[in-house]
């Protein structure tokens, strides 16, 4: 038997909801009951694999409806900044690179700016990359061990900042 727990979302354990989910996971584990936790919200602020790992969940027990029908597995963010730089040829195309906090800014010659958000500054892994031109957000890519989602922003300039 497998018990399926249906939830909207998960965060950084900022409320009792996350702890209740973890307690449920531990309780089922102690008595040997297979379990899956289903999350139905579109979770893009942070990688769901990082959020569930923070609480100690086994990612094999996590089902996120937004990638369930793909071959992308739930995983913590381990996509390296070096891989991104190589794939997009950023070292050659960028006229200026600077790091501010957990963000690495690449100024490209055509006025496009890429902003990579570090999920772990020490390991140099990323979880998001934003594409900005003339202070307007155009696109954002989301990463775990691979790119798993992309958002496009096509509204008026004032809506994309």
What residue ranges belong to the model's regions?
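Terminal non-domain segments
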Residues: 1-79
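Repetitive, compositionally biased segments used for assembly/scaffolding
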Residues: 84-161
């Amino acid at each position: 038997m497998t018990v399926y727990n249906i939830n909207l979302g998960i965060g950084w354990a900022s409320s009792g909801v996350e702890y209740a989910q973890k307690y449920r996971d531990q309780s089922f584990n102690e008595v040997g009951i297979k379990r899956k936790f289903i999350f139905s919200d579109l979770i893009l602020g942070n990688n769901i694999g990082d959020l569930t790992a923070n609480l100690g969940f086994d990612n094999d027990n996590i089902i996120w409806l937004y990638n369930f029908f793909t071959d992308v597995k739930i995983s913590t963010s381990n996509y390296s900044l070096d891989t991104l730089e190589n794939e997009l040829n950023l070292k050659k195309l960028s006229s200026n690179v600077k790091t501010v906090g957990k963000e690495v800014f690449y100024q490209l010659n055509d006025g496009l700016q890429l902003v990579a958000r570090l999920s772990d500054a020490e390991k140099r892994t990323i979880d998001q990359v934003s594409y900005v031109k003339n202070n307007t957000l155009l696109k954002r890519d989301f990463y775990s061990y691979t790119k798993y989602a992309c958002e496009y922003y096509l509204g008026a300039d004032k809506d994309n900042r």
